[in-house]
Design a protein with these regions (language model features):
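Glycine-rich flavin
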Residues: 66, 88-102, 118-125, 130-268, ...
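A Rossmann-like FAD-binding core segment of flavoenzymes
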Residues: 171, 205-208, 212-225, 230, ...
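Acidic, low-complexity mobile loops and tails
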Residues: 1-36, 45, 83-89, 99
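FAD-site-proximal beta/loop scaffold in flavoenzymes
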Residues: 252-269, 356-431
Length: 564
């Protein structure tokens, strides 16, 4: 029998086949996820309507399909069709109402929410996960993963252009942004499908819809005419963040993009002006530059990446300038205008003077803010932070309402995916009576510029502000053999020691493999490892990790392969 695509959500006329979860010969049962289907409304699972054996798969990942197309051929029994129209992408028959009483309700399926749900289920809690959009939240769909996919494509393209350094030359290199975006989407789809698989395997019920509080322990979830009233002993709010809005005249002009739009832009501009020199802005600045785009960055603060140490900020500034990226700090954007030729004109004030930059596109990258939209928190006793900047929580992630927790970007502690995930685990442990607290002193942070930047623990400025007596050791990647073979000699490893306590309290890395190396520094600080123990540890050669060993030696006798 032929299994066809019988409907699509919304007004979509066609879709793309995402991750295929089955193989010829597989036996599937009712509601098993066969494919992921991607429409312009997002990603949805295509589930089996009965128990049957897969005889032939007629489509491939990435193939465009439309209603009526045969997706696969199977043998077995299909559940009889209902008289009412059924949406095979997760929607139930319209008008359904259901009352539920459970142990744990998680609102939001980002890296905080879905980890909380899986961890809670593994710990024996009857768990429901609610999500109004795609599984994976901002990080997986329009944040961490898509950005890093583009960063890698840009890096590969730039290396091919500069192959002469490595002894080869490629002529007529052509960049196809449609394929770059398609690769990004495929990676995302695979990961979304993986989350859906894990939820099914852990018997977690996923309800797609928008959640709003009725009272302190009752939540209404609506999608279309379907309504679910859920009463939960414990609720974890994990609704993440949304792009911050800024009042700049002209911000709604058609050539102005936000980060979400930039991640799906299949037409590469010749030039772009980026408003914001923070993490998002600088990651996009380097990836666009590696794609050959002329980039300018306008930053309000007196330096880019103001959250990292000054020497790290200055190092990445020098590298950016060497790549032709224009940087304008201490600059306030006053308006955006459209030129006669349709280009964007960004007007800003700098040192009392009005200046302007002209570019094909403008990217606004000024950060994100907690997303509490539609939750109807006014129906509860939940307290918010000052100026309503997120949900107020204690170190155990509890709100002021017993049984309600808030994790991730929505509590506005630290906007990092790995922080959200760990907060979720701590919350579930506390639900189970373990009385745990979230520790923020040793949270690694990574910025995917070129080269990468990573830091953990206290910064030099924080130590100075706290009057901590410190010693600093730096080891440059220019003295590291592996970095030289990679053609990446810029940057350094920096380690900070508290002389009074006799332990390492912070560190920064700017250079090759920083995103991976930071885990070693995190472990060193978290476990209070002494210099002696680190010095006695054998680091593999040739690796960039040897730089950590050298930097630690620099705190005492001095590095072996570098002499200041």
């Amino acid at each position: 029998m032929d299994i066809k695509l019988e409907s699509l959500s919304g007004k979509s006329k066609s879709a793309k086949v995402g991750k295929i979860n089955i193989q010829v010969g597989d036996k599937v049962k009712l509601n098993d996820v066969l494919f992921q289907i991607e429409t312009n409304k997002g990603n949805s699972p295509l589930k089996a309507k009965g128990s049957y054996k897969i005889e032939e798969i007629k489509v491939t990942e990435g193939q465009e399909v439309k209603v009526g197309d045969t997706l696969l051929i199977a043998s077995g029994e299909v559940v009889a069709k209902e008289t009412k129209k059924v949406d095979y992408f997760g929607n139930l028959i319209q008008g359904k109402k259901e009352n539920l009483n459970i142990d744990l309700l998680v609102v939001g399926a980002g890296p905080g929410g879905y980890v909380s749900a899986i961890y809670g289920a593994k710990k024996g809690l009857n768990t429901i996960l609610v999500e109004k959009d795609n599984l994976g939240g901002t990080c997986l769909n329009v944040g961490c993963i898509p950005t890093k996919s583009l960063v890698k494509s840009a890096e590969a393209y730039n290396e091919a252009l500069n192959g002469e350094e490595f002894g080869f030359e490629i002529k007529d290199i052509k960049l196809d942004m449609k394929k770059v975006i398609a690769r990004k989407d495929k990676i995302r789809n695979n990961l979304v499908g993986g989350i859906d698989y894990l939820l099914n395997k852990n018997n977690i019920r996923l309800i797609k819809g928008e959640a709003s509080f009725i009272d302190n322990h009752k939540v209404l979830v609506k999608k279309g005419r379907d309504e679910y009233t859920i009463e939960a002993k414990n609720i974890i709010i994990a609704t993440g963040s949304k792009i911050s809005k800024i009042s700049i005249p002209g911000i709604d002009l058609p050539f102005v993009l936000n980060s979400t739009e930039a991640l799906s832009n299949t037409e590469l501009p010749k030039s772009i002006t980026i408003i914001g020199g923070g993490v998002i802005g600088m990651e996009f600045a380097f990836l666009y530059s590696n794609f050959g785009v002329k980039v300018n960055v306008v930053e309000y603060e007196n330096r880019i990446l103001s959250m990292v140490d000054l020497d790290v900020s200055e190092e990445i500034l020098d590298i950016a300038k060497s790549k032709g990226i224009g940087i304008y700090t201490s600059s306030k954007v006053t308006r955006i205008e459209k030129s006669e030729s349709g280009e964007g004109i960004v007007i800003f004030e700098n040192e009392g003077n009005e200046k302007l930059l002209v570019s094909e596109k403008v990217l606004v990258a000024i950060g994100r803010e907690p997303n509490m939209e539609g939750l109807n928190l006014e129906n509860t006793d939940i307290e918010l932070n000052d100026r309503n900047r997120g949900i107020k929580v204690e170190s155990n992630l509890k709100t002021n309402v017993e049984g309600i927790y808030a994790i991730g970007d929505v509590n506005n502690k630290i906007q990092l995916a790995h922080v959200a995930s760990h907060q979720g685990i701590v919350s579930v442990d506390n639900i189970l009576g373990e009385n745990k607290e979230m520790q923020y002193e040793c949270i690694p942070n990574v910025i995917f510029t070129a080269p990468e930047i990573a830091s953990v623990g206290l910064t030099e400025k924080q130590c100075i502000d706290k009057n901590i007596n410190i010693k600093i050791s730096k080891f440059p990647f220019a003295a590291n053999g592996k970095a030289l073979t990679m053609g990446q000699e810029n940057g350094f490893i920096k380690i900070i020691k508290d002389l009074d306590l006799g332990k390492i309290v912070g560190g920064s890395i700017i250079g090759p493999d920083a995103s991976s190396l930071i885990s070693t520094l995190t472990l060193i600080i978290q476990q209070n490892m002494s210099e002696e123990r680190i010095a006695e540890t054998v680091f593999a050669h040739p690796t960039t990790g040897e730089g950590i060993h050298e930097a630690v030696l620099g705190l005492s006798i001095g590095a072996i392969h570098y002499n200041e």
